[in-house]
């Protein structure tokens, strides 16, 4: 897993091993996923992410701020719209997203579920001031994402 923030030059051979490569829309463009004309819809970014699988990285996650995020791998591609949130402070939301994504993937959960969990974590994080104090407890994130606790059984 590589979170390419801020974007720095990375050898294509190193990017090719990323599973997933995590980027925001600006970083995505910097590595060749999309252009300024890519549009802003989740579906458009999902399709761009899917086109990058195998070409740029093993799997791709693109974060899109208050719109949510998308992910793609050889198994498929997904959108996760962000729930409406009363934004107080966005500091640390990206780190909260990435940490939640990494935690769920480390548990053996699917990329699709990890994406939903991470979007919920990021959306909850922006509703409080600060960084660590704004991260919601696991059970609150699970409820927000509509997921159950425990390892993936499928």
Task: Pin down the residues of each PLM region.
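Conserved beta-alpha-beta core of the PfkB/ribokinase-like small-molecule kinase fold
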Residues: 1-44, 67-69
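Conserved phosphate-binding/catalytic region of the ribokinase-like
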Residues: 9, 34-154
